[in-house]
């Protein structure tokens, strides 16, 4: 028996602790408001300014300005639909087969004990709606530019900013952001570690810093993944109901850093987060490919290498269907392409299954959703194709480079005369912040802009 396996006699009765529906601030429902806690969370996210801003943030810049392309808002809606479908699929008996073999426990018993762990539609949609709200304008270029400017103050990263918006910045409360339930916040945290620890150790690397943003070697400043130290208080509150063993295990990295340029990644995430992340990966790999095909960013010739790679994966479904799907993806008939996209999404969703992560005390950490190795390999082919031919597309890179320059210059300008140039609310926050926290206020302001708003402000300056 492997180290992390659990005997049937060790299976604890399923109990979801009531603390997972607690909020940082007392927040009783309003009169006659009978909504469950996660439905209230969903409403707060949907009605937030940060969520609305996603409609003006482009998912893939090279695809251009037309009525078809996806924004981060439409992407988030599609992730929510896929996430809900994954939750529905995980209720079926066959999704427990692999876990049943791992634990040597009858799959019917597992289904009975674990189904109540699954997030409600309100909860999974909340996570999917929220997952991108911390991403700054101009994609990875904008993210890396802000990390460059914040390197000595804890760095910047989109997932960390999402947690910060939910727990501090969104003005639903004065100082606790949207004041969401603990379980919703747990589901948003993909990387439960401090960003400054997970990121490359810039102080040791002595990378060149150039005051002219045109000449910054931006790839030296790609951030790691984690939580800002500024938000440690809320992160500690989030995990305070876990046992000491669970907290330590949950925040472990996959490996020990071997050199200061290396980014570290955490090993674990919650069940809810694993479902949301799968939904995001499927939407990225399949729907972003659809955008690129429709708008002519990629062509059948470029697809051939991916087609060959997919045929080599040991999957009966792929062997039987990939020729037809590849043909229909690039068909002149729109309905054929939509059928191919639908078949691919269905393939990924219907292969989801339960897995054991480690011997956590908390069941929401002990189990995750996963795809079998051959299906992960297939999804990896799609994601790599999008990365190689869409994200790395020269038009995308030029737009991100332009955005990186704009954000870096704006940061420098605001930092030079914040009391004159920042909006009043932001200026008040800047003035009230301690000296070591003032740059974070400027960073929050720039990160919250849409692509178009950032361009307008830059032109004003």
From Swiss-Prot:
InterPro entries: dGTPase, dGTPase-like, dNTPase_2, HD/PDEase_dom, HD_domain, PHydrolase_assoc_dom
HD domain sequence ranges: 72-285
GO biological process: dGTP catabolic process
Keyword annotations: Hydrolase
Region feature Disordered, mapped onto this chain: 22-41
Cytoplasm is among the record's keywords: no
Annotated Pfam families: HD, HD_assoc
GO molecular function: dGTPase activity
Feature: compositional bias, Basic and acidic residues: 24-41
Family: Belongs to the dGTPase family. Type 2 subfamily.
Protein name: Deoxyguanosinetriphosphate triphosphohydrolase-like protein
């Amino acid at each position: 028996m492997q180290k992390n396996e659990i005997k049937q006699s060790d299976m604890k009765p399923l109990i979801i602790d009531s603390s997972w529906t607690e909020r940082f601030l007392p927040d009783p429902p309003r009169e006659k408001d009978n909504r469950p806690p996660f439905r209230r969370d969903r409403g707060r996210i949907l009605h937030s300014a940060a969520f609305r801003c996603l409609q003006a943030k482009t998912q893939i810049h090279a695809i251009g300005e037309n009525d078809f392309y996806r924004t981060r808002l439409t992407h988030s809606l599609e992730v929510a639909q896929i996430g809900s479908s994954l939750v529905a699929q995980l209720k079926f008996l066959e999704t427990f087969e692999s876990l049943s073999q791992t634990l040597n426990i009858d799959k019917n018993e597992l289904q009975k004990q674990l189904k109540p762990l699954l997030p409600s539609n309100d909860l999974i949609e909340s996570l999917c709606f929220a997952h991108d709200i911390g991403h700054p304008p101009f994609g990875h270029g904008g993210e890396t530019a802000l990390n460059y400017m914040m390197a000595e103050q804890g760095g910047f990263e989109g997932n960390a900013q999402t947690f910060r918006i939910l727990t501090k910045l969104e003005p639903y409360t004065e100082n606790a952001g949207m004041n969401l339930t603990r379980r919703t916040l747990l589901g948003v945290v993909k990387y439960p570690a401090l960003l400054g620890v997970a990121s490359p150790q810039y102080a040791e690397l002595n990378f060149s810093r150039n005051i002219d943003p045109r000449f910054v070697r931006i790839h030296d400043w790609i951030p790691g993944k984690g939580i800002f130290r500024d938000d440690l208080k809320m992160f500690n509150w989030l995990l305070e109901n876990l046992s000491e063993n669970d907290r330590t295990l949950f925040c472990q990295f996959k490996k020990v850093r071997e050199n200061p340029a290396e980014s570290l990644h955490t090993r674990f995430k919650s069940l809810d987060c694993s479902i949301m992340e799968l939904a995001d990966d499927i939407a990225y790999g399949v729907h972003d490919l659809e955008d690129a095909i429709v708008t002519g960013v990629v062509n059948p010739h470029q697809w051939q290498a991916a087609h060959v790679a997919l045929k080599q994966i040991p999957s009966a479904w792929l062997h039987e269907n990939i020729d037809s799907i590849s043909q229909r993806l690039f068909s002149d008939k729109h309905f054929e392409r939509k059928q191919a996209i639908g078949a691919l999404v269905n393939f990924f969703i219907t292969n989801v299954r339960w897995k054991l992560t480690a011997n956590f005390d908390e069941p929401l950490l002990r189990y995750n959703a996963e795809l079998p190795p051959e299906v992960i390999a297939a999804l990896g082919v799609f994601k790599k194709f999008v990365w190689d031919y869409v994200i790395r597309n020269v038009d995308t890179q030029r737009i991100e480079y332009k955005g990186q320059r704009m954000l870096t210059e704006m940061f420098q300008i605001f930092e030079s005369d914040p009391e004159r140039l920042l909006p009043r609310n932001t200026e008040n926050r800047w003035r009230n912040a301690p000296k070591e926290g003032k740059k974070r206020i400027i960073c929050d302001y720039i990160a919250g802009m849409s692509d178009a708003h950032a361009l307008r402000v830059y032109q004003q300056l």
